[in-house]
């Protein structure tokens, strides 16, 4: 995934700074103006062929100028006619409502570097904040709605 808009990447066009969309999974995070950094992320393709009980929402999105390289071994990040044009989802939440009014919730982010401490520091803890809010959303119930993380020594 390569970002063509310099306002949506940091240092290199494959260090993506996506748009954060306000959804149930990350509402507070989105309203606080944090940034997210997703190096070497992959685009997520949503399908329309899902059960009626399933809802897929975009959490993180590239700009319209992003593109997916078809030939990743070409040695070039320049856009070619063969490349797939964006925008792309880089994070989604998936909810399925069951018959007994219970829900199954999944959050998927497409960068394996999202939780890397150096990457997180580059956005002043934004990645960690988003992950924690996502976990809190998935774990919330009538009994509890908070997640506790032990303090770290710096």
Identify the function of each model-found stretch.
Residues 1-143:
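Acidic, S/T/G-rich, low-cysteine, solvent-exposed domains in lumenal/extracellular/periplasmic regions
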């Amino acid at each position: 995934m390569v970002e063509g808009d310099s306002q949506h990447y940091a240092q290199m066009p494959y260090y993506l700074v996506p748009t954060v969309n306000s959804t149930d999974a990350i509402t507070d995070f989105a309203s606080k103006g944090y940034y997210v950094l997703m190096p070497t992320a992959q685009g997520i393709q949503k399908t329309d062929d899902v059960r009626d009980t399933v809802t897929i929402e975009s959490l993180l999105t590239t700009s319209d100028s992003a593109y997916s390289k078809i030939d990743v071994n070409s040695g070039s990040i320049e856009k070619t006619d063969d490349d797939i044009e964006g925008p792309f989802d880089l994070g989604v939440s998936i909810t399925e409502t069951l018959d007994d009014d219970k829900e199954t919730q999944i959050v998927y982010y497409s960068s394996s570097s999202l939780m890397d401490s150096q990457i997180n520091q580059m956005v002043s803890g934004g990645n960690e904040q988003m992950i924690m809010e996502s976990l809190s959303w998935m774990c919330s119930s009538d009994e509890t709605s908070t997640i506790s993380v032990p303090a770290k020594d710096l």
